[in-house]
Amino acid sequence: MSASSSRLLFDCGSLDWPNKSLFGDPTTRDVMNEHISSTWNAVIRRHMLAPNANAETILGRDGLPSAQFDAYGAMLPSFIQALNAPTTRLRISAPLSTAESILCADASHAPWLYMANSVCAYEATHLQPVQTFIAFNFAHGYCYLSLFIPLSFRITFENARGFSRFLEQLPDILGAYPTLAAIYKTMLFAIRLFPEVLQAPIPIIAKRPGVLQFHVSDARGLPPSWFPMKCGSVASFVALITNNLNSDLLNGIVGSNGDGEHYTNWNSGHDHWIVNRFITVKDLHSSLKSALEVDLDTEGGRNAVLDLLLDLGVTNLVRREKRFPAYFQGAESVYLLLSCERVGNELVAVQDALQEPLANYSGLDLRALIINLGGLPSRHSDICYTRNIFENDNHLVWNFEFYRIASITKNAQIDRDVLSSSMANLFSDFVSESSNGQYRVKEPRPVVQYRVEHDEPVASSAPSAWWQVLIGITTAILGAIIFFLWRCFLRAKRVKFQAKDSFPWFTTSGDDDSPPPPGDSPSRPPGRSPDRVLPRTVVRDLSFNDDDDLHSVDLNEAGSRFGEVVSLIARGNLRELAGAIPESLSNLTLLQTSASGSGFYTMVALYLATLGDAITAFHEHNDASPATIQSLRTLELQLEARGLRFNEAGTPANLIQRGVNSSVGRALVRLTQSALLATGENFRTRMATTLERIAAERLNTLTAYDQRVIEMTTELLAAIKPVLEVERSELTPHLANAEALLQVYNNLFSTDYVSASLLALRREMILRSAEGRVGEQPTSASDAANEELVQRSMTKLDKEIELFQAQIDSQRRAVTITEASNLRENILQPINTVANIAMAGAFLRGGARHRMPGMPDVATPMPNPFRAFSGRGHSLTTTRSGGLFRRPRV
């Protein structure tokens, strides 16, 4: 806080200060423009907190309360209780970490900031009131709108309409729960368009201690012990963030905490998709092809085919935290819903035929039925899904991709058209390959080729063909000459080096410095130092030459160690890469300085540096930030386009992402939270379930983080179990041990879990102790005073119990939160990175070679025909459900 932070709002020496206006004399008070005021009315109607909603808490994106307002209101409810309140508890503070002190300050010396009022909000540096709305509160996730209320009073008449359009777009673009970095970029944009808002005050932006969660304050004050940011105006906010752009606090969420990827509007109505069974068309045809190779005239062969049909498909394909897969191999990789009743009836018919006696159905009859199953996708194309179709039909939006909302419907319709025209061809190919021409299906309709039609001007007469040929030959010759001269120019700029047998130490030809003696190496390579730290950035910030690729690299010049780096990347073993990255970075730094094709070396070095950070974060915390994964994927696309091969099982970025999604430790931490919130028999049941899960996971290969979670969870549950079983006389040491272990658990895994059972026992002990003291007969004036103190303690404990019960009730009510408040989040993802990925994907798919507008139509080549057994089918689960497709016999 600055030195002026202790200055009070009003002059206590003036006797008429209670009658003063908070915003000055009404004749000089700022008035909001009419257009801006009407825009705010529309925004308020859409994003205000419902009148019947609980305004005393902050709800996170999980629907659970994360903070409580008006701490002093509960401590000082009346004049008498205010005088009796312990002095040591009147300052609400929390330790300020070094990372938090960069942007935040301790404001525990200003208790009025934490008090709710019906008058105003405060700004941080001078602790003065700011103009804001006090008749209502914004909905959860939209508290950042309070930042733009004081700006509305500073807008000039000329910019009023432009600022109104800016306000209309603000909630739709940022959505609910944006990041602090997104708010910073929005403020920069507002300053560029409306420079008059530069000195406008803003309400306090408060940070939750130890958690990447922010809240823009209003008349309810700050949550207890939260830290205000060290800025009180638009200019100071922008300057503060600009000076600390490398801080991890910029990834914090305004209004909530956590940044996991999930479907933002997933609700209980979508839970049935978790247990529904899907199968790709490719896997379906491969499985049926295998069934046709079995001898169906024997009992054993029919049982084998029956088992195969019962195991068709996978479950758990999609859920709230798991996105529906995208397909990249063509229409045969779309997903067919097997849990549909129509598909189930056909499968049950084949199943019943397989269970009939051998005399009723011959092998040829069964083969015909099995081949007919291959036409399920063509007969039921309406239940074939791609990612676009699934998300459009269920109105689901994946967070970080709100920019795709407008294109999901269009892409889904295109996918539907392609599938309806392609499935018949796939079925025809399957029948011809599986039956050797014995069975035939009707001729499928041709696949529609989608292209953009352009209006061509009507020519009066056809040009001469020989004239066009002559122009084409002349253009080709001129292009070849220009290309040859350009290559010669590039080669003339390159410096020649002498290659060594081992990793090279290069010197430029014609240099005045004498080369080092044979067998020795210079103290350092020319140019930059080998231990220089590579910049952390994304590919869009670099300018690479298209000629700098793996094919243009001279491996003899680069040395054997660079070849080892290339082979390590191709193998994709994360542990080998983690050990080899530090040495490889120093070698690549030298190559960037001295060898030809330095652009490619720079790209590989940047990729290895980013990958090393991601591997370290994954091994330590089983986590990797979305920005790091996005940068890795961008770099992998660039490297793959330049000839570097990756493992077919998945790139390192994919392996890290899969490891994060399937983290055993994080799943156990969430399971432990569920157990701790339960009481009585529910707690014992969930504790037993958690221990069974731990016992099952110990048999698998685990990371160090998973082992640490398993050990701490086992110790915590083992400490809580005797607390629920011992006698009340022996409860105190066990309860203290369990509470201490729970605190250690929270510190280790950055959680704030509480145990409902432990809290109930602790409060029961306090009540019993107080009741015992009340039952004693007072023998003196001191005993009478003690009895009065006990009565006050009882009253205080009753209020604490009521507050605790209110928190429990608010957690239960929070489950019914509307999906509108959680629809949009994190809208301002790095747009340039997404554009780079899209461009790279377009070039890799040959997008640059497509027909350009104005060129004559050319025949589009037909796709390669489907080949059975071209690859092994991939299954998410191996769970067998014998009665999945069985229906009861009548």
From Swiss-Prot:
GO biological process: proteolysis
Region Disordered, residue ranges: 506-533
Residue positions of the active site: C143 (for helper component proteinase activity), H215 (for helper component proteinase activity)
Superkingdom of origin organism: Viruses
This enzyme's EC code(s): 3.4.22.45
Keywords: Coiled coil, Hydrolase, Protease, Thiol protease
Coiled coil: 788-816
First-tier enzyme category under EC: hydrolase
Site (Cleavage): G255, S256
Ranges of residues in domain Peptidase C6: 135-255
An annotated Gene Ontology molecular function: cysteine-type endopeptidase activity
Similarity annotation: Belongs to the bymoviruses polyprotein 2 family.
UniProt-recorded name of the protein: Genome polyprotein 2
Species assigned in the record: Barley yellow mosaic virus (isolate China/Yancheng/1998) (BaYMV)
Top-level taxonomy: Viruses, Riboviria, Orthornavirae, Pisuviricota, Stelpaviricetes
